[in-house]
Each structure stands twice: as C-alpha cells, then as structure tokens.
C-alpha cells in the first residue's frame, strides 16, 4: 500500500524494490543510453557509486521526515516509525556480552521494508545529469561530444553534498569510473577527484548488477565469466550423477543453479553476442 501511494512520486530511474522493475530493466535502460552515445560518436562517462555501509548508515529520523514529505497519513508514518524504533544490539565474545546499545540508524535485514526505507531515503538524490538507481546501487552517466568539457567533477561534488546532508558516505576506493568512446578522446578527459583529492580509479570493465560491463560494450568478458562458473557447476553435476543421485534431483540442481548462471539478465546481452559466443 505504501509503495502504491508514493510510487507516482518516485524517481523513474529507481528500479529497485518496486514491482515490475528489475535489474534487467535497469541494465537495459542504461545500456540503451550508452549504445546511443556510441552510435552518435559521443562519449559516455560513467560513475559507479558505492555507498560505504549503505544500509547501516541510514538515519531513521531522515527516513521518517522524507515519508512525511511524501504526504503519507500520520498513522502510516507512525506505524513505519514504530518498525524502526527501539531496536538494540550488543556484541558477544565467548561467554561475555556487551551492554545493549540503542540504534538510531541502520535498516533491519531480511525485511522488505529495509530496501523500501533506503529507496525513500535516496529518492531525492537528483543530480544535474542522468542517474540510475537500484536500491543502493547508483550509476551516474554523462554524455559528451568529443570536444566538450566534462562536468563529472561537478556531479560528483553534488553527490558528496547529498551524502553529507543525509549522513551517508561514499566509499571512494570502491567507486569507479568508466568512459565509453575512442581511446584518443578518453585520454584528454581529466581524472575525477574524490572529496579527499584522490583519483577515482578509471576501469575498463565493471561488474554492475551481476553483469560484467566492458568499455567497448562487447560481451566477451561477461561470457567468459559465466561459462567458467557454469563449467565448474556442470563438473559438480557430473560428480553427483556418478554418485547415483536421482535424475529428478540432478534436474533440480541444473534448473536452480546452472541455468540461472547462464540466463541471468540475458535480454540485456544475448542479442548482441556473436554466433561463436552463442555456440560456447
């Protein structure tokens, strides 16, 4: 009911924890943008943002204030607040326990309301460029003509301002950037600096929502990875068969373990692979 009430107000580039939207939808939308830039002889400068301990740093009072801003009834806001309130934790070492500590932040794990709380928190993260979100996975894209000066540093600074206002933090060591385009044009683009003045690492490939994205937007790396995973699991399947495991159980193992490895998000990449890769 809560999602139905506030869904029309959600950022349309948020794909996580919402019925009818998935990692596949998010990936297709992003890759369409990057392929379009490539087709137009433009550059796509992409920032893959990692929030440090994203769910653990969520401040309950900020989430509640944003729920109120969505215009939800007071009774619903109080119910949601009661879900977050009065949570405690303590540490056990051997037979010794620490004192209980009241939690004013962090999202409960294993509950659907946890991811929902995070997308409510991050909904107003709106930069001056295209931003895709899948719960706490955030991808920032800037499209550039070959002679255009990049503004990604400005967008990164906007992101830092948002994290400061919402008591979040960017993990600069895990945040990466990738530029799709010609090598000559990429070399001319200055490095992106973190808030600590360190360079954000520029990579040629990145695992995004379970898919390996390469700078040339080809799928050799991704296919090699999934074939390697599937091969080891098929080897284990053969061992199970030699051990006399019933056929029904072997089939269940294939359907639940091997097939998802090969088919995950296949609408994103399968139509772009070569016939040789398909035969692999």
Each PLM stretch: what is its role?
Residues 1-3, 26-37, 149-166, 231:
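Inter-domain linker/hinge segments that demarcate the starts of reverse transcriptase
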Residues 1-107, 142:
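Conserved pre-catalytic core of RNA-dependent polymerases
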Residues 95, 154, 161, 169-204:
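Short, conserved micro-motifs composed of acidic
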Residues 54-70, 127, 138-164:
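Catalytic palm subdomain of template-directed nucleic-acid polymerases
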Residues 132, 197-269:
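Basic, alpha-helical interaction scaffolds
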Residues 15-24, 36-41, 52-56, 69-75, ...:
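Conserved, non-catalytic sequence blocks in retroelement Pol enzymes and Pol-derived host proteins
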Residues 4, 82, 119-123, 256-260, ...:
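Short, residue-level hotspots on alpha-helical faces of the histone-fold
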Residues 14-18, 45-54, 80, 106-114, ...:
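Catalytic palm active-site di-aspartate
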């Amino acid at each position: 009911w809560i999602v139905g009430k506030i869904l029309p107000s959600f950022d349309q580039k948020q794909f996580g924890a919402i019925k009818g939207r998935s990692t596949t939808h998010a990936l297709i939308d992003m890759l369409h943008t990057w392929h379009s830039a490539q087709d137009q002889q433009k550059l796509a400068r992409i920032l893959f943002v990692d929030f440090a301990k994203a769910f653990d740093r969520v401040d309950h009072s900020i989430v509640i204030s944003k729920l109120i801003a969505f215009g939800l009834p007071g009774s619903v806001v109080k119910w949601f607040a009661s879900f977050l309130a009065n949570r405690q934790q303590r540490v056990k070492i051997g037979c010794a326990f620490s004192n209980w500590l009241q939690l004013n932040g962090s999202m409960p794990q294993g509950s659907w309301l946890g991811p929902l709380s995070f997308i409510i928190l991050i909904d107003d993260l709106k930069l001056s460029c295209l931003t895709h979100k899948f719960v706490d996975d955030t991808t920032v894209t800037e499209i550039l003509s070959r002679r255009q000066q990049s503004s990604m540093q400005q967008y990164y600074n906007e992101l830092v301002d948002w994290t400061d206002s919402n008591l979040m933090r960017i993990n600069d060591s895990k945040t990466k950037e990738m530029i799709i385009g010609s090598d000559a044009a990429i070399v001319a683009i200055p490095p992106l600096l973190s808030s600590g003045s360190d360079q954000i690492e520029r990579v040629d490939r990145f695992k995004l929502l379970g898919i390996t994205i390469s700078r040339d937007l080809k799928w050799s790396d991704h296919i090699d990875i999934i074939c390697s995973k599937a091969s080891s699991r098929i080897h284990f399947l053969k061992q199970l068969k030699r051990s006399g495991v019933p056929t029904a159980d072997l089939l269940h193992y294939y359907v639940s373990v091997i097939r998802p490895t090969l088919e995950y998000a296949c609408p994103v990449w399968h139509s772009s692979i070569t016939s040789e890769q398909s035969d692999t």
